[in-house]
Amino acid sequence: MNWITNYVRPKINSILGRREIPENLWIKDPTSGEMIFHKDLEANQFVAPNSGHHMRISAKNRLMHFFDDGVYTALENPKVVTDPLKFRDEKRYIDRLKDYRSKLGVDDNILSARGTIEGLPIIATVQDFAFMGGSLGMASGEAIIKAFDTAIAERRPLVLFSASGGARMQEGTLSLMQMPRTTVAIEMLKEAKLPYIVVLTNPTTGGVTASYAMLGDIHIAEPGAMIGFAGPRVIQQTIRETLPEGFQSSEYLLEHGMIDMVVSRLEMKTTIARLLRLMMKRPAVFNPSDPSPTDSQTSLSTTKAA
């Protein structure tokens, strides 16, 4: 059987000119079970077209869709000491880092860039959950602080997309130190009177929730995102009580006043640009596709003006 599989079948395929189908050509929507063509899903920012389910998206893909014409300049992340504790669990930490870096082609889980959205110059910082669960360590902490420093130096607002399981246990206290350090960077941005908008994506938990992810001027969440400090099972085992269903979802948190908005990824750029214009007192941009105000709205505005 192995001989047929390993030799005969490839030989026949090569003769007939048959090509192997890539494994990720079709992606299944976990909510509806629909099979979606990968290129269609990518063009739709990894939002399922029928169900609206928001799948995970890479940092590069997110920035490409977020910035005008997909054009941005990535900020160089600072270099930090690798594996200062010589940590080992099932695998050496340094080997784990090498595997992720080789697989994803990035040094860590933070990608920051400068660019424009609807003509507004901003700095955007994205956490990539694919790299060690978006965990907060020294490298990601330094990269976030560098983004805030750049925003202050260039007088740009900062938009941060969070996605994390919390602090990186392989770095111990050194990872926990990034929580107050990033908090100080946020305070410096606010002292400079520059806006800081946080977009909470699925999932945002642990030390990230307890620090920079919940310190924004405005908190926006993607639909269905899990947002919290500890996981639901940990909380339930601690307090010994049954918890409300979906109590850590973005919709539940919006209903209970923990966040300001739940916005689809497809409308995120327009929404944030509008918010930044309001916060920075910039003139609105006329969009011909927007419906014109009704007569009653016009007369009401005229009455108020009078």
From Swiss-Prot:
Keywords: ATP-binding, Cytoplasm, Fatty acid biosynthesis, Fatty acid metabolism, Lipid biosynthesis, Lipid metabolism, Nucleotide-binding, Transferase
Position of the signal peptide: none
BP GO annotations: fatty acid biosynthetic process; malonyl-CoA biosynthetic process
Superkingdom in the source lineage: Bacteria
Pathway assigned to this chain's UniProt record: Lipid metabolism; malonyl-CoA biosynthesis; malonyl-CoA from acetyl-CoA: step 1/1
Domain CoA carboxyltransferase N-terminal: 25-294
Primary site of residence: cytoplasm
Record protein name field: Acetyl-coenzyme A carboxylase carboxyl transferase subunit beta
Natural source organism: Bartonella grahamii (strain as4aup)
Single GO cellular component term: acetate CoA-transferase complex
Catalytic activity as recorded in UniProt: N(6)-carboxybiotinyl-L-lysyl-[protein] + acetyl-CoA = N(6)-biotinyl-L-lysyl-[protein] + malonyl-CoA
Biological function: Component of the acetyl coenzyme A carboxylase (ACC) complex. Biotin carboxylase (BC) catalyzes the carboxylation of biotin on its carrier protein (BCCP) and then the CO(2) group is transferred by the transcarboxylase to acetyl-CoA to form malonyl-CoA.
EC number: 2.1.3.15
Protein family membership: Belongs to the AccD/PCCB family.
Gene: accD
